Amino acid sequence: EISECLVGSEMCIRDSNYIYWDDGSSIVIQNGNLQYNTKTELEYSYLGYLYGTMPYLTDETTEKFPETEISGIDKEAAIEQVKSILDEIGVEVSKPRVYSLTYEKLEENTDYSQTDPNGNAPHQWTKEDAAYAIVFKGTIDTLPITEVGYRSGPAAGERIVGIVGKQGLIAFHALNIYELETENELSDEILTTQTVLENIQQKFRNIMITDKVEIEKINLEYVPVLKNVEKGEYELKPMFVCMARQNIEHSTDKEDNGLIGDSSIFPIIFDAQTGMEIQIGGTY
């Protein structure tokens, strides 16, 4: 059913987790992940340009690929195409964010002097290569599931994204998708954002820092917490996911240059009921 929803019914090779078509397209379904890639995505790597080295998207992604109209692609139809797949597999999502991977922006973010490990140069973009990236957040009773998370593996958060170009669907990834088995009532009330800000102030009051940290966003989201390693079970807990930015100045070797600036974006996550901080990269 999923394969027909994505590309139709004709296929080349199929087993329990993989489907391959003779045109180079493939679907991988494994451990809460569904990845559909066409040969175009595998060769051009739209998702690589969208995410870069980050596991999630930030405001810098919006600056890099702002939402604009792309000639020859119906944006609303592109959104509906991706949403229909999510409806088919039963994933509840929030309103999408749209990023425009225009020819100009793809060119701007491509370094043609770089080659991949096989020595291949980047794809030479044309106006026909423009595409929309349609990004959703999974939800439970309208509360979003984090994209950020606090560690590697499924607890890194969900990723739901579709790439739609003039030729149709180029890629669709639904990663770290959770199937609810039970729902429990919250044991405590949700803290206020003011309490969260006070916790952040206390955190950095005890750390000697020379560069100011600014909190750009505070979102109440479900964050997966590992419950049973052997069974691969997670508990989705309400957390405040705070996106912080730190502008760092570095001294240069050249006296006439003085200082140069750099920017770092990182999450700070607090349990929304206890106020306890979740250590990034560690355990709960």
Descriptions of predicted regions:
Residues 28-48, 146-174, 252-284:
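A short, surface-exposed beta-strand/turn
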Residues 2-6, 11-13, 164, 218, ...:
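Generic hydrophobic secondary-structure signal
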